[in-house]
């Protein structure tokens, strides 16, 4: 397989081993204009986050669109467990609601991540019979925690109640939902301990710092990480061809809080619009995505088309079909 065929545009600092033919782009220069110019040369004006509810999901055009979609997917997914806490507690073996959200960002500075946290959770439209949902955001270090506290104090959120804490804080956690913000692999053990303590209340991983293909190397913690169901994920990619490059995206967006049956979609730009080229029931590995895009580029390459034309020409001359 050709090397460096595909490049992923990501904010999550995904890392790959040296044997992989994919490389993730992480700098501000590489991620510049991620949402607009990379994905659409013909922007659509009728975008709505509710398009996650349609049979054919629509990837976001701008960062604001991605935030709106992610907020809609997560809030509707959280509504069921938050509105039925007594039912959850009565069933001992019921699975703890664990969700995961991934939104690429150009700027991963403390102030930018704090702004993103407010955009997602500050005005999250969760429908609940009881008022004042409390969401606890756990940050991996004190710097991020302080930035988030300053952001939420500056922009008062009406609902829900938000609290920002350092994950290393030795205090009793009390909340309706706990979110691990931009966690690193080094704190997975602590995350598992907290999640087990909070059972059966919902927990969320938001923008993990590790890559999906790294998770198989987490040992006993691989199962813990894998127990978080992705409700929203959006990753840009670039397909490198012989004569030109093509742009696309890997995308998942849960519809109306229904997790079962939601697929992962791979889109590639064609004639200024993104079109679905593959669907996966489970999250595809880097190699699987590369295979799909490699085959697509091979089929559409001038060399392949010329070879097919010559083969058809010879068949016609010989009277064969």
What role is predicted for each listed range?
Residues 1-57:
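N-terminal chloroplast transit peptides
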Residues 139-144, 207-213:
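Short beta-alpha junction loops
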Residues 187-189, 212-215:
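Short acidic/glycine-rich loop or secondary-structure boundary segments that cap or lie
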Residues 214-299:
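A conserved mid-domain beta-alpha-beta active-site/ligand-binding segment of alpha/beta enzyme cores
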